[in-house]
Amino acid sequence: MDYKTAGVDVQAGRAFIERIRSSVEATHRPEVIGGLGGFGGLMRLPAGLNKPLLVAGTDGVGTKLELAQQHQAHYGVGLDLVGMCVNDVITSGAEPLFFLDYIATGALSPEAMAQVVEGIAEGCRRSGCALLGGETAEMPGFYDPGCYDLAGFCVAVVEEDEMIDGRKIKPGDQIIGVASSGVHSNGFSLVRKVLALTEANKNTLFGCDNKPLIETLLTPTTLYGQLVKNLLEAKVPLHGMAHITGGGLPENLPRCCPKDLVTVIDPSSWTRPELFQWLQDAGQIPEHDLWHTFNLGVGFCLVVAEEVVSDVLQVCNEQALQAWPIGQVETASPSTGERLRGLPS
């Protein structure tokens, strides 16, 4: 018996590395030293930094992977993986430097895995960070054939005196909501239950435009890194930022705000995408659970002074991203301890 008989194809792994090499190396920034094949990726810090802080984040794509694997949507989950990590680290005003991926699978499918990595590489390219390395683990008997899991790791850098940590947020500041592309990459355990309940498949259409339901659900996560970079380069003072993922607005927006303040949102200030209404109706999801599970059309939030709202909206428009003033910051009531107000009762 040999390793291949046991379920691990080393030759297929080598062929896979050669297949993805050009996509990976196309993401490399000038600071990257060397190419694929080393025990660790090497990268210099960008020149001109005085007191750099490194910002690190890690995440996955959750059970969206199961739906993607069922429908061979491998490229999109690569973009999702980058979005889940990069959108977190940029909330501190940091510039993404490099990304690492981990792929675990039951049996290596070079074509499917190449599509995943090409999606990761494209996400890195759009975010300005290098895909510095990764690991692909073939684990027969642990994962079913055709099944894989993903994890991503992003490291970014910010000058210590330019770090955005919410300390500048004050009463009267405005909250700008930036549109999501859909469900993004959280809440899919609930999504999959709704799909099973309705017996939806790849031919199921929904909404007034008769959109393909599965394709819409698998739309990749919006990458907000270029937007934040453009705002910072335009010297727009950002007081706080929040990536709206698991827990929705109620559990993510308050994370960027000091505890003596409360965020107050107006749900009527943006139109909830019809996909979320379909999920609620089809799954009979209570309104409270909907708000605490999904982004409901707002994937990222910016907290700014009232006088720069128009500047922020202009930069969002230049990025072809819809954005709306969705609320404001107020002084919190010590007696209630609430961090967010305005949700439907």
From Swiss-Prot:
CC terms in the record's Gene Ontology section: cytosol
Localization terms from the record: Cytoplasm
Keyword Zinc-finger attached: no
Catalytic activity: 2-formamido-N(1)-(5-O-phospho-beta-D-ribosyl)acetamidine + ATP = 5-amino-1-(5-phospho-beta-D-ribosyl)imidazole + ADP + phosphate + H(+)
Pathway membership: Purine metabolism; IMP biosynthesis via de novo pathway; 5-amino-1-(5-phospho-D-ribosyl)imidazole from N(2)-formyl-N(1)-(5-phospho-D-ribosyl)glycinamide: step 2/2
GO MF annotation: an example: phosphoribosylformylglycinamidine cyclo-ligase activity
UniProt main location, coarse: cytoplasm
The protein's Enzyme Commission number: 6.3.3.1
Keyword Flavoprotein among UniProt keywords: no
SUPFAM superfamilies to which the protein is assigned, alphabetical: PurM C-terminal domain-like, PurM N-terminal domain-like
Superkingdom of the organism of origin: Bacteria
GO biological process: 'de novo' IMP biosynthetic process; adenine biosynthetic process
UniProt keywords, alphabetically: ATP-binding, Cytoplasm, Ligase, Nucleotide-binding, Purine biosynthesis
Entry similarity comment: Belongs to the AIR synthase family.
PANTHER family: TRIFUNCTIONAL PURINE BIOSYNTHETIC PROTEIN ADENOSINE-3, TRIFUNCTIONAL PURINE BIOSYNTHETIC PROTEIN ADENOSINE-3-RELATED
Protein name per the record: Phosphoribosylformylglycinamidine cyclo-ligase
Species of origin: Prochlorococcus marinus (strain MIT 9313)
